[in-house]
């Protein structure tokens, strides 16, 4: 397992789609992680001050998006790992999963994100939730 510095087990979910944001938050909280939410990269700034262990971020939303969103987030919290999520991965439109990984994302997941895939990626990157 490749654990990170920051607040162990603390995750920031950034997505402008309230349904997807709440769904991923519910899955992560249900697994025992502490989760904060934001609607876009600009709204995430305060939460990034807490140095979460992981950010799960949509790639297409208002404000910085795509590789620019990854650069923005990594610039604010370089130690924080990032999972990029997008409905555009594999569609030929916008950022590809490879682009996201090249920009600094540790993992890239296509929407609709599956619960098992998200939880497996999170556990691999930051370990199990704190007891």
Per-range role (PLM):
Residues 1-12, 114-131:
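Non-catalytic signal-transmission and effector/linker regions of two-component phosphorelay proteins
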Residues 22-30:
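Charged docking surfaces used in two-component/phosphorelay signaling
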Residues 37-54, 96:
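Acidic, metal-coordinating helix/loop segments flanking the phosphotransfer/catalytic sites
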Residues 39-40, 64-68:
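Acidic catalytic/metal-coordinating carboxylates
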Residues 46, 67-79:
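Short amphipathic alpha-helix used as the core "switch/output" element in two-component signaling
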Residues 58, 86:
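Active-site residues of response regulator receiver
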Residues 61:
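Receiver (REC) domain active-site loop signature in two-component systems and cognate sites
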Residues 68, 89-109, 120:
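Alpha4 helix (beta4-alpha4-beta5 surface) of REC/receiver domains from two-component response regulators
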């Amino acid at each position: 397992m490749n654990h990170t510095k920051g607040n162990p087990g603390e995750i920031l979910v950034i997505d402008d789609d309230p349904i997807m944001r709440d769904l991923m938050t519910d899955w992560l909280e249900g697994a025992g992680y502490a989760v904060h939410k934001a609607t876009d990269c600009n709204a995430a700034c305060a939460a990034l001050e807490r140095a979460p262990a992981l950010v799960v971020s949509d790639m297409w939303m208002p404000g910085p998006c795509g590789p620019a969103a990854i650069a923005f987030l990594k610039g604010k919290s370089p130690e924080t790992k990032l999972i990029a999520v997008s409905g555009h991965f594999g569609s030929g439109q916008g950022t590809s999963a490879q682009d996201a990984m090249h920009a600094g994302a540790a993992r890239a997941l296509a929407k609709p994100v599956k619960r098992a895939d998200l939880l497996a990626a999170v556990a691999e990157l930051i370990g199990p939730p704190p007891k």
